[in-house]
């Protein structure tokens, strides 16, 4: 099984065809698409709210109206990917983590933020969550009845709520639950950058030094990859905008974390 996390920056950067033309049977593809969510929200007259957290990360505040835009957009992206794959003769199925209880998550009841005045505050967590599990039986069932499974980052809470979750967390949980040996993370840059230049490899020996040069989403991706190395998973963070991005990444073109 090939596990691919397709970042929204690739989709919004015009790289969707590059990726779908390179997907092979036996692939599980998790996609993002936050930039498209913003566009849909603006058309709906809903202003996106991005939260800043004390750890330096940012996240989307997901209230009820934002959740509607998020689900609509993610499922549109999902079906765009599925339609492109099926047009190539690849039998693809697309679903969210809600379908058949594929991905479960715990709602974030409270989140800590830094407000516009620089003060640290605790606010309601809205409809966002942290992934708690993946139903391996359902995933295997989907893989045995199709060539490719495409997953949107929407999860199901124990209370039956749809939750906005991080696609990287879904990829991490699938990698762990299904004993995946390699994870490809496609973004809009050539890997992990240090002083503007991509580095070939991150290992336990140089990880802390490299982390100092990373921020935001890339830091989160690298931390996920480093966690997976402890479980024997090799992660390649690579540019999804290049030709044959998945094949190139599996051949080591990008930053290999192992």
From Swiss-Prot:
Annotated binding of substrate, by residue: 33-34, 60, 164
Name of the top EC class for this enzyme: transferase
GO molecular function, one term: ATP binding
SUPFAM superfamilies documented for this protein: Carbamate kinase-like
Site-annotated residues for Transition state stabilizer: 5, 221
Presence of keyword Zinc-finger: no
Cellular component GO terms held in the UniProt record: cytoplasm
E.C. designation(s): 2.7.2.17, 2.7.2.19
InterPro entries according to UniProt: AceGlu_kinase-like_sf, AcgluKinase_fam, Asp/Glu/Uridylate_kinase, LysZ
Subcellular location: Cytoplasm
Main location as per UniProt: cytoplasm
Keywords annotated in UniProt: Amino-acid biosynthesis, Arginine biosynthesis, ATP-binding, Cytoplasm, Kinase, Lysine biosynthesis, Nucleotide-binding, Transferase
Catalysed reactions, as listed in the record: [amino-group carrier protein]-C-terminal-N-(1,4-dicarboxybutan-1-yl)-L-glutamine + ATP = [amino-group carrier protein]-C-terminal-N-(1-carboxy-5-phosphooxy-5-oxopentan-1-yl)-L-glutamine + ADP; [amino-group carrier protein]-C-terminal-gamma-(L-glutamyl)-L-glutamate + ATP = [amino-group carrier protein]-C-terminal-gamma-(5-phospho-L-glutamyl)-L-glutamate + ADP
Family matches, as Pfam families: AA_kinase
GO terms (BP aspect): arginine biosynthetic process via ornithine; L-arginine biosynthetic process; lysine biosynthetic process via aminoadipic acid
Biological pathway: Amino-acid biosynthesis; L-lysine biosynthesis via AAA pathway; L-lysine from L-alpha-aminoadipate (Thermus route): step 2/5; Amino-acid biosynthesis; L-arginine biosynthesis
Primary role: Involved in both the arginine and lysine biosynthetic pathways. Phosphorylates the LysW-bound precursors glutamate (for arginine biosynthesis), respectively alpha-aminoadipate (for lysine biosynthesis).
Protein family: Belongs to the acetylglutamate kinase family. LysZ subfamily.
Name listed for the protein in its UniProt record: Putative [LysW]-aminoadipate/[LysW]-glutamate kinase
